[in-house]
């Protein structure tokens, strides 16, 4: 197949290109050439900026277009309209499109709505990420119809992760000592290895799948994630009382059931997830990110407060 990747050199895009090349597909990358430009030297590279200059794509079509970073609806619409003669359009959205996580929604769950708010203004930062992604989905479906494949990942983890949101845990395990973690250990954490997601997406394109898919694992108990470590489990109420930041200060943690979704559809369509140890090893090579994760001092303070309360 002939595939066009919008981006394709950072995290998920990079993994998709690697998976596609491993399967013998022909790739073209369209990006600004500013991130990891040295990657994939034998792949055709078109330079431009999807917000202002799509001229390198004019008059061309591919078997599938893969859009990993669309966020502004008008920008996504322009690329979809220009590439409408391509076979299908694969848009990477997010489970953040759901209006709430009161239950683990399947793909028909309620999505967030911006109402009458001015989209252009709201797109200037990431505080409206979910609703804007939902609008981007609609733009793609409006142009490509049943040739659109909408992928809604949860937290993506693994090699080359630039966010630090999962990387904190393999790094923390490697450091050893007493580890603070959110109780109960039976609570599930949902995430997907970037390599598993990329391989599924490339295979889904080859199989001409369409429609919407929640794209994450069925879930791993926290106790399994931290198996073998010296863990002190503390309840949500304690973490909230001491203003521990969800998701970023204590990665993966959101009070209650967290960001869980129903993944029955993608599992039925052959999403394969590798062993946890392999995912942890892959993530361990990614760098820490400043401001993500508990500092050793903050963790020690919280552990001391917890033990004093429990004495």
Question: Which sequence ranges carry the predicted segments?
Answer:
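NAD(P)H-binding glycine-rich loop region in Rossmannoid oxidoreductase-like domains
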Residues: 9, 34-87, 91, 97-99
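Glycine-rich Rossmann NAD(P)(H)-binding loop
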Residues: 6-7, 158, 182-187, 213-220, ...
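Conserved beta-loop-beta element that borders a ligand/cofactor-binding pocket
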Residues: 136-160
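Alpha-helical substrate-binding/gating segment
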Residues: 170-180, 187-220
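Conserved Rossmann-fold NAD(P)-dependent oxidoreductase catalytic core, especially the SDR/UDP-sugar
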Residues: 78-134, 149
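Mid/C-terminal beta-alpha module of Rossmann-like enzyme folds, strongest
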Residues: 200-256, 282-284, 289-311
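N-terminal Rossmann NAD(P)H-binding glycine-rich loop of SDR-like oxidoreductase domains
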Residues: 3-23
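Glycine-rich "substrate-gating" loop/helix at the edge of Rossmann-like oxidoreductase active sites
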Residues: 154-163, 183-195
């Amino acid at each position: 197949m002939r595939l066009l990747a919008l981006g394709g050199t950072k995290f998920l895009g990079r993994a998709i290109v690697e998976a596609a090349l491993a399967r013998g597909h022909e790739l073209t990358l369209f990006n600004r050439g500013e991130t990891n430009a040295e990657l994939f030297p034998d792949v055709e590279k078109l330079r431009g900026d999807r917000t202002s200059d799509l001229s390198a794509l004019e008059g061309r079509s591919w078997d599938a277009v893969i859009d990993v970073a669309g966020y502004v609806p008008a920008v996504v619409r322009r690329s979809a309209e220009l590439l409408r003669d391509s076979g299908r359009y694969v848009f990477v959205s997010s489970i953040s499109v759901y209006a709430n996580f009161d239950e683990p929604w399947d793909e028909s769950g309620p999505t967030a709505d911006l109402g009458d708010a001015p989209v252009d203004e709201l797109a200037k930062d990431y505080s409206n990420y979910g609703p804007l992604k939902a609008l981007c989905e609609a733009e793609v479906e409006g142009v490509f119809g049943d040739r659109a494949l909408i992928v809604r990942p949860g937290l993506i983890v693994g090699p080359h992760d630039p966010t630090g949101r999962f990387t904190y845990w393999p790094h923390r395990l490697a450091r050893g000592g007493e580890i603070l973690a959110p109780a109960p250990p039976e609570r599930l954490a949902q995430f997907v290895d970037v390599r598993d997601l990329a391989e599924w997406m490339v295979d889904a394109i080859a199989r001409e799948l369409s429609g919407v898919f929640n794209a994450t694992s069925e879930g791993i108990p926290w106790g399994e994630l931290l198996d073998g470590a010296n863990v002190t489990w503390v309840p949500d109420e304690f973490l909230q009382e001491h203003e521990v930041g969800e998701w970023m200060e204590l990665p993966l943690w959101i009070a209650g059931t967290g960001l869980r979704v129903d993944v029955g559809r993608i599992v039925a369509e052959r999403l394969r997830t590798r062993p946890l140890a392999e995912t942890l090893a892959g993530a361990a090579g990614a760098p820490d990110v400043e401001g993500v994760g508990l500092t050793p001092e903050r963790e020690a303070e919280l552990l001391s407060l917890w033990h004093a309360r429990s004495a």
